[in-house]
Amino acid sequence: MYVNRRFYDKYVSTRDVELLHEYSLRVLKEVGVSFDCEEALEIFKKHGATVEGSIVKIDEDLLNQALETAPKTFTITTSAGETKIGERYKPKTVGCYGPPKFLFEDDEYRVAKKDDMVKFLKLMDTSDVTDFVNNSAYDTPDLDKTKEDFYLPQVAMCLKYSQKPTYGNVANSMNVRGKSLKQEAKDIAKLYKEFYDIWDRPVLLTNTCALSPLGYSYEVLDNIMGLVEEGQPVTIITCSMTNLTAPAALLGSVIQNNATILAGIVLTQLINPGNPVIYGTVSTATDMRNVACSIGAPEAQLIQMASLALGRYYQLPVRTGIAGTDSLKPDYQAGVESFMILMTTYLGKSDFVLNHAGILQAYALGSYEKFVLDEEVNRILLRLNRGIDISDVKAEKVFDAIKKAGPLGNYLSGRTPKEYRQEHWLTKLFNRQAGNPQPIFDEIGDLRERASKEVEERVAGYTLPDLTKTQKDILNRYLPEDEKF
């Protein structure tokens, strides 16, 4: 079981959470949330919500009914096994998500292409701190966009390159034509069920983002309804910006986000009671000097910690935290900001994190080097969360060791003790060598150089999953021509 440090308790009290909940209820009942979808509006009407045009107002009773059916934990099942998500389990992770451009090893910014996305899939597949895979870039310029549906070919790439479960994105009206997005979402779910030959359980998890302030677009709603009808879990998130799409006060951002997320969760439970859903937010600050989304701001951590406390109050699985930075390069700023925001995931203890590695410039850039550097940050935070192993038995043992060494003695004798190996994290990329700095630097090089070398070694050592003929035949119906088996 993962130790839950509940770091959010240092930010918000139980009374604070109750106040946030109280005003969220008022927003739901008195202000409402916009749903740009007739089918969703009819579902709310049928279950007694107040519907005024596209605005849905939800009372406390309807909210509580939905929260009663939403599960505390759930499991994603694939042919490789089970991935459990919930408060008692280690946070689950997935990498760089959807930036249009990458920072490449030659220090140039370029539009990502399909092979660049595949390289990220290989890094995610070979990562010991990455649980899911996803498309790190979408709708790349080298895809065949004459097809009515060039989204499913991208989805199929995740199944080709990894046996880890997939964290999906919503289809949109740009990459799917000729059918509804709801049908596309159902088709994606059916592809995964057929590929795994698992028909009665969740087989993938999908990210769905509200439209702040207090709204859901028809595209997102179509995807939510299609996936939930197929029994597949969704993450409902907000990504609001203070003083732009959320109030200037952090308190207002948390209240508005909470009301928005809860409204989406209610819809999932009205469609399919008991369907797994994750309560999530990556809402953040706005730098009003240039009206920019600032995902590495300390206010982002504060907003997400408070939202994490609310998710725990509702006893729902929670998604918060990112290796988020506004930096343009994997530099000092990137490390500081990524560590700070990822604290929400590992020490606040949320249950899922998207963009746990590899993102730059407020989601606009991906970086292979930052991915492997962020892996080290994830490992450090995992180690910090374990804490110190303190027990009567261990105390007696270390006292004997202290007594044996005595004053001015030492502990360096024989083989490295088991306790050292168990309790110390040893970095793969960061420098810990001591001595004359110049020869050390000449030997190991700059940190980015070491990261780049790690990337190339990982990609070179990658091997495709061993798929069955049936699985290959299924994927060949969808994969881009140059990716078929």
Curated annotation (Swiss-Prot):
Keywords: Methyltransferase, Transferase
Highest rank taxon of the organism: Bacteria
InterPro entries: MttB-like_sf (IPR038601), MTTB_MeTrfase (IPR010426)
Catalysed reactions listed for this entry: Co(I)-[quaternary-amine-specific corrinoid protein] + L-proline betaine + H(+) = methyl-Co(III)-[quaternary-amine-specific corrinoid protein] + N-methyl-L-proline
GO biological process: methanogenesis; methylation
Factors inducing expression: Up-regulated during growth on proline betaine.
Documented EC number(s): 2.1.1.-
Pfam families per the UniProt record, alphabetical: MTTB (PF06253)
Single GO MF annotation: methyltransferase activity
Function per UniProt: Involved in the degradation of the quaternary amine L-proline betaine. Component of a corrinoid-dependent methyltransferase system that transfers a methyl group from L-proline betaine to tetrahydrofolate (THF), forming methyl-THF, a key intermediate in the Wood-Ljungdahl acetogenesis pathway. MtpB catalyzes the methylation of the corrinoid protein MtqC, using L-proline betaine as the methyl donor. Shows weak activity with some other quaternary amines, including carnitine, phosphocholine, glycine betaine or betonicine, but cannot methylate free cob(I)alamin.
Protein family: Belongs to the trimethylamine methyltransferase family.
Subunit note: The proline betaine:THF methyl transfer system is composed of two methyltransferases, MtpB and MtqA, and the corrinoid protein MtqC.
The protein, known as: Proline betaine:corrinoid methyltransferase
Species assigned in the record: Eubacterium limosum
Lineage: Bacteria, Bacillati, Bacillota, Clostridia, Eubacteriales
Gene name as annotated: mtpB
